[in-house]
A protein has these predicted regions:
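Small-residue-biased structural context
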Residues: 1-149
Length: 149
């Protein structure tokens, strides 16, 4: 089982658009619960994740549509692909294959930072520009800068 401490909230994930940051905190908490729970609780957590992801992605997709966010198609397609995988894995977990569910949870933990740093950060900047006319100002606590390769 993956170490649940590997995927916890960090200010590194803050993007500067409050509603998105709040939803991302919830995403991290639910995935972390999936990584660390016993098998008897896993189905409930993955179903909670599916409900969260449906609402999370619908909210972001709505922002992109309502504001005519230029690169929205790729972003929306990625959301749809994640949801499709989640629904497929839920069916496998219902048959008792918790290992497949845990692989999905680990994959979500691996996927989220890249998605947030690339696709969601662009959307966050867009949303702040639409509402306030400029880029978000983000104050992060205890974050060590990543080295660029």
């Amino acid at each position: 089982m993956p170490d649940p401490d590997k995927f916890s909230w960090s200010d590194e994930y803050l993007l500067g658009y409050g509603p998105m940051d709040a939803t991302h905190r919830e995403f991290v908490a639910i995935v972390n619960a999936m990584l660390g729970c016993p098998d008897a609780e896993f189905l409930g957590h993955i179903e909670a994740f599916a409900r969260h992801a449906e609402a999370h992605f619908k909210e972001e997709d709505g922002w992109m549509e309502r504001t005519s966010f230029p690169p929205r198609d790729c972003h929306v397609d990625e959301h749809a692909a994640v949801l499709k995988s989640v629904y497929q894995v839920i069916e496998v977990v219902r048959q008792g294959d918790f290992a497949e569910g845990r692989r999905l949870a680990a994959a979500l933990a691996d996927w989220f930072p890249g998605h947030a740093f690339h696709l969601d950060s662009a959307l966050s900047q867009w949303m702040v520009k639409q509402s306030h006319g400029g880029k978000p100002v983000v104050l992060r606590r205890n974050v060590v800068a990543r080295e660029k390769n």
